[in-house]
Amino acid sequence: MQRIPPIFLTVVLAAALAIPSFVGLAQNPSSSGPYKVLKTAKAGGEGGYDYVFADGKARRLYIPRGGQTGRLTVFNLDTLESVGTIPNVSAGGATVDPKSHHGFSTTKPVTMWDAKTLKVIKTIDVEGRPDGILTDAYNSRVWVLSHQPPHATIIDARSGTVVKTLDLGGAPEQAVSNGRGTMYVNIADKANIAVVDAKNLAVTAHYDMSSKGTGGSGLAFDAKNHILFAYYRQPSPVVVIINADNGNIITTLPTGTGVDTVAFNPATMEAISAENGGSMTFIKENSPTDFSVEQTLQTMVGAKTLALDTKTNHLLTMAAEYGPPAPDAKPGPAGRPPRGPMIADSFSILMVGK
């Protein structure tokens, strides 16, 4: 996933929009359902943003910010009040290993910090272009993902040393661990799911999804029933629901426009996707063979990533408001429509729940 710079963040407007608007509110109404936006916190500050990470045990929310004053901002997960900042960390994503209490962010070099004190411990040289990041609790290893080779750099969370780099066979987007020694990675440019032996660090299979969609993005995992939820943006946005053990496709369902990151909540048996068009879609797993779209909730345009708070079952997402683009503004990344400058202090964190 590409980090969103402040000038080129995409606004995906409904085709039938009658009155032009450049603020962050989504233009489509919410469907009925149990979820709503519980709280909106105006965090403000300049700089782009990308991933968000929730540390449920420590009750902290991490949001890296870009721009001239790149930093890692830290918030109270319950109140959304600021609790600290790690300066000079302009990253796409962040993660914390719950065993060592070491945090990592996808700067280049990768920054490693003490999650208790927010003090930088060291930097770690890596190749490629660090983007996504996650901790595999199976063996306390941090996976740094890159669209450029090497596609994955695996770091020991305790020592901060690089264990190995991997070629995943294409550009990775979101990855998930089954907690038992297997990692699954949505390969964006190949329309497949890479299956990786997380102990021996070797790719063992690729599940081909090209018949269902291209432009892979989010990936979520139901550990109880061994089910993957793989999201694709083209030709129309869908989630492909897959048997994780053999790659067999169970079914597909529609999603909103511009899915980026997703999560599966085992407490509610729901796969949830954040969508750049200003919505959040909840897929209900009624049984291992029965799935349905439970709700599409209005959030904010640009709120395309999320984090799950496993203690409260709340979802956290974020977005900002933007002015109109200049007449000569160039398209954003991947041909996205141009966007104007960020409205000062409009950056907001949204808490979603029942």
Regions found by a protein language model. Give the residues of each.
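Cleavable N-terminal export/targeting peptides
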Residues: 8-11
